[in-house]
């Protein structure tokens, strides 16, 4: 008789390495999966959970969130991680930077980042890690210490921040970014960030493949000009106006610039974030052909796959890059289905009503950018993906295996012996209507309000401990900071 802490019986196990699910039980000991096989002996198990034939997905590795951007960081860690559990997310990788929002301060990461860790310790219901954005020359010099001391292996550039605001046009981005006097956040800075990340890869060759740079690809000059054109014409309103003010070719141009800079600096690990349009992904594909020595990874969000400028529920759907017309949504699905897209994320950024909307409330240019959505990530992908012929295994790759490999999480992303027992049980035949009131998030609205989904996460396990039961978060926070690469 083998002793287990948990045996999950009668589930259909989904893994990235096979298209369809297979019937099996999952045995867990000390937070790790020790066996996946049919008919496991449960006599010595401390806990047995009957899966009822549900799909067992690896816990989602949501590689793009924004804890603390609009709410206190400790609050988001506690509350928004509950929404994560609802969506089957067990590892949340959240972007962080100095400047306005977040901790609302500048300075060195040597002082800033320990405060970030302190504010989130013992609060999250899921495991978490941080990507950091080098906003100054001093931050670039800190990259090796961030890798060595804090296990931060992924960094970010916001390509439009130097000349265009987070929510629209801005004449004073230096104050917003809190960059040192005399420094510019521009293409030259992006080049030097790339050189700094590449130097870190060379300094730590054993983990070089896990050290990468992610880029938000939009072009400030194009967006500023088109925002003025849209406002002066006055013909478009709402999300259609916002999409037109940040046109897809702005993404494509930024992708092209970022790609050439990667070639110039010799940095091969580049992640192109939340590509929202056919033109953006087309540019990414073209750059991959032009620079085959660069290991590009391409990301899209579940929001851009589920909603468009017409179906999203009002200006609450404002986000960067914008939600697009339906033809771009269809194009993104083409790229998901043909394997061009590497992973799908939520870009979860809880923005409560009092912060989100301006006056008048329906003026999209007065609204803030971003919304929550982690709770709909896996349900949305299973619902819409399977409807379009996407295999279950490919969904597991897009939501867990691929981001875990890129971002230095070797024990995450697969339901197999030796991996963390991060498990999401999904009922693929549960039809339900999205209502913001049913979410654990502090956000009172959702752009997906009224959407009908046909799959639901019923139970979520973090390292073998159940954190979601019958759709409700249970227990105290047990999430841990992921010092990457984990297990090193």
Locate each region found by the language model.
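C-terminal cap of metal-dependent C-N hydrolases
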Residues: 358-363, 369, 417-483
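Active-site metal-binding motif and surrounding structural segment of the metallo-beta-lactamase
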Residues: 39-56
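Divalent metal-coordination and catalytic microenvironments
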Residues: 11, 31, 53, 64, ...
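N-terminal metal-binding scaffold of metallo-dependent hydrolase/deaminase domains
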Residues: 1-44
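His/Asp/Glu-enriched, well-ordered alpha-helical/loop segment
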Residues: 236-266, 316, 343-344, 350-428
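Histidine/acidic residue-rich metal-binding segments in metalloenzymes
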Residues: 141-157, 161-344, 349
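Metal-associated gating/positioning segment near the N- to mid-region
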Residues: 51-123
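Short catalytic-loop micro-motif centered on adjacent basic/acidic residues
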Residues: 94, 129-132, 269-274
